[in-house]
UniProtKB/Swiss-Prot annotation:
Role this protein plays: May function as a nucleic acid binding protein that modulates transcription of genes participating in the IFN response.
Annotated protein name in UniProt: Protein NS4
Compartment annotation: Host cytoplasm; Host nucleus; Host nucleus, Host nucleolus
Chain coiled-coil ranges: none
Keyword terms, alphabetized: Host cytoplasm, Host nucleus
Signal peptide: none
Annotated GO CC locations: host cell cytoplasm; host cell nucleolus
Length: 77
């Protein structure tokens, strides 16, 4: 009777150890996934900011050309 209980307790202890180890592994994987997602998000933000800056630079160049044209028209007319 005692021996059976010890076996059951040992079995439960091993199962608990396996479960705990699996939980640690899952937590590590989730943390890695989170880190990767944060890096991807930062890269996307950088890419979006770069695209926005390029768009704004083009807009500024266009406005500068328009201003030059207006100045020329003013000088001519």
């Amino acid at each position: 009777m005692v021996r059976g209980r010890n076996r059951r307790a040992a079995r439960r202890k091993r199962a608990a150890k396996r479960l705990k180890m699996q939980m640690w592994i899952d937590a590590y994987i989730l943390q890695w996934d989170l880190d990767q997602a944060q890096k991807d998000l930062e890269n996307a933000r950088t890419r979006m900011l770069t695209e926005e800056m390029e768009r704004l630079e083009e807009e500024v160049e266009m406005l500068m050309r328009e201003l030059e044209l207006l100045e020329r028209m003013e000088e001519d007319g």
